[in-house]
Amino acid sequence: MSDTILGKQGIDPRVVQLATQFKADQGPELQQMQSWLSQWGQPTLSMTPGVEMPGMLPDQDIAALKNAQGVDASKRFLTGMIECHEGTIAMAEDEIKDGQYPPAVALAHSISTREQQENTTMQGILASL
């Protein structure tokens, strides 16, 4: 979703800044989690169409974002990212509660805290558009 919004013109600068930040934050986290899975002999994460995870947006919402412009695109991005973050927070909270590998639990704490803060920021921006 970040790549989609970053490829558009007329997007609120606060939204562009968030999308850029999301890409910077999530890349290393995903690499770390995939590295752990690989070390443990487990399959790595996949973004296979049709495979659902908490917070994943339906294809029609992604298509609507791709077709949207300006303020509408900004609103769709923020709404979708809030939903995505809520799913990520739920998964992180599960890891915090049940996780057994301390580095993964620590990463889950970091992700949960950051994404809760980001949701507050996104809700504020959304209310101002």
Predicted segments with their positions:
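All-alpha RGS (Regulator of G-protein Signaling) helical domain and cognate RGS-like helical scaffolds
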Residues: 1-129
